[in-house]
């Protein structure tokens, strides 16, 4: 009898554990700024919806490959950069969203609302690809993408590898340098890129590599996403950021619901939460992400280092990530022929 009582008690306790266990929302994201995101994004959502957020962290490629191998199982939401978002959609891993659960989309910039169509998730932040150069080393100001081909920059610049988020913009700029569309005439774009090669000391795959090259005096200029600027500026105070006269390239990060998620509605509520004015402002103030919510107002000091303001965002060159993805294999091969020699 005593054994039976203990047995029933154990069953009851295990059932209580199931009954009172919090619902979990599994989010695939980068591992950066974890403490700040916990404080301003995850914890408030957990409290409001009585849910536990579980993170899967890593870079774009690693996390997307993991999602492909598992066919999306076990993950509810995924943060990805533009080209990887397109890849995930084409692989059939992204669920179509119910926009009625995302009322805050009406408060964000147009370019962020439906970057891959109304069926898929919005961008929650916007960055830009521009040029950084050291004014102590380069006296003739850099103002244009075309300046990357100047003969007095031989061996002085670094550009992002083709496989990075910003990499494809180098091909687009090479095409523009000779007045062609890189998608329509890739042979001319890569011929133009080959002409720039003499100026490129090396390519980089990690932002820390670029910052280190500046710090060690190996390079005097580089193409980068704007978030790298603060790191370079810390090492090289004479470094400046340039939004080229033709316009910087827009780079967005998206949040999407993974197809097959058993928590789809909750996941959509999380996306809406991230787009809210409060969360967008809180995250901007601690320099984690640039806001896309148009209601977020920042002072000049508060917006320093961020991509902020309708005039700046309106000046961007957009990137057709669908075309980038469809040309990716050929572009990588052509790139490697140039830079592996």
Task: Name what the model sees in each region.
Residues 22-87:
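Early extracytoplasmic/lumenal segment of secretory-pathway proteins
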Residues 95-104, 121, 149, 237-249, ...:
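Short beta-strand->loop
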Residues 130-137, 173-178, 251-263, 271, ...:
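A bilobed periplasmic-binding-protein/Venus flytrap-type ligand-binding module shared by bacterial periplasmic
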Residues 300-341:
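Extracellular/periplasmic bilobal clamshell ligand-binding domains
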Residues 32-38, 74-75, 79-201, 205-215:
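Extracytoplasmic ligand-binding site segments that recognize negatively charged/polar headgroups
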Residues 127, 191-196, 204, 235-259:
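Periplasmic-binding protein-like
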Residues 258-316:
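Mature extracytoplasmic/periplasmic domains
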Residues 84-87, 215-216, 221-238:
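A ligand-binding cleft/hinge motif common to bilobed small-molecule-binding domains
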């Amino acid at each position: 009898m005593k054994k039976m009582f203990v047995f029933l008690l154990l069953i009851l306790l295990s059932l209580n554990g199931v009954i009172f266990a919090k619902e979990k929302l599994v989010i695939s994201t980068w591992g950066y700024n974890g403490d700040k995101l916990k404080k301003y994004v995850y914890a408030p959502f957990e409290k409001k919806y009585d849910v536990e957020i579980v993170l899967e962290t890593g870079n774009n490629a690693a996390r997307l490959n993991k999602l492909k191998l598992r066919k999306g199982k076990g993950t509810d939401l995924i943060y990805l950069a533009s080209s990887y978002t397109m890849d995930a959609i084409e692989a059939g891993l992204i669920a179509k969203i119910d926009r009625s659960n995302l009322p805050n989309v009406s408060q964000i910039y147009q370019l962020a609302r439906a970057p891959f169509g109304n069926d898929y998730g919005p961008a929650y932040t916007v960055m830009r690809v521009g040029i950084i150069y050291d004014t102590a080393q380069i006296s003739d100001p850099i103002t244009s993408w075309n300046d990357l081909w100047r003969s007095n920059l031989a061996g002085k610049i670094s550009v992002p590898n083709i496989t990075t988020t910003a990499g494809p913009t180098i091909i687009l700029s090479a095409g523009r340098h000779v007045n062609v569309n890189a998608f329509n005439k890739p042979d001319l774009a890569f011929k133009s890129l080959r002409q720039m090669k003499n100026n490129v000391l090396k390519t980089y795959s990690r932002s820390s590599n670029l910052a280190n090259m500046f710090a060690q005096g190996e390079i005097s200029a580089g193409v980068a996403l704007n978030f790298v600027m603060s790191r370079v500026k810390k090492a090289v105070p004479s470094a400046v950021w340039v939004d080229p006269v033709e316009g910087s390239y827009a780079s967005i990060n998206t949040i999407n619901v993974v197809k097959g998620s058993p928590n789809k509605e909750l996941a959509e509520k999380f996306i809406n939460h991230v787009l809210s004015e409060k969360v967008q402002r809180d995250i901007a103030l601690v320099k984690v992400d640039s806001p896309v919510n148009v209601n977020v107002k920042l002072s000049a000091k508060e917006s320093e280092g961020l991509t902020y303001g309708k005039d700046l965002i309106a000046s961007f060159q957009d990137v057709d990530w669908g075309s980038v993805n469809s040309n990716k294999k050929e572009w990588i091969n052509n790139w490697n022929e140039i830079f592996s020699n």
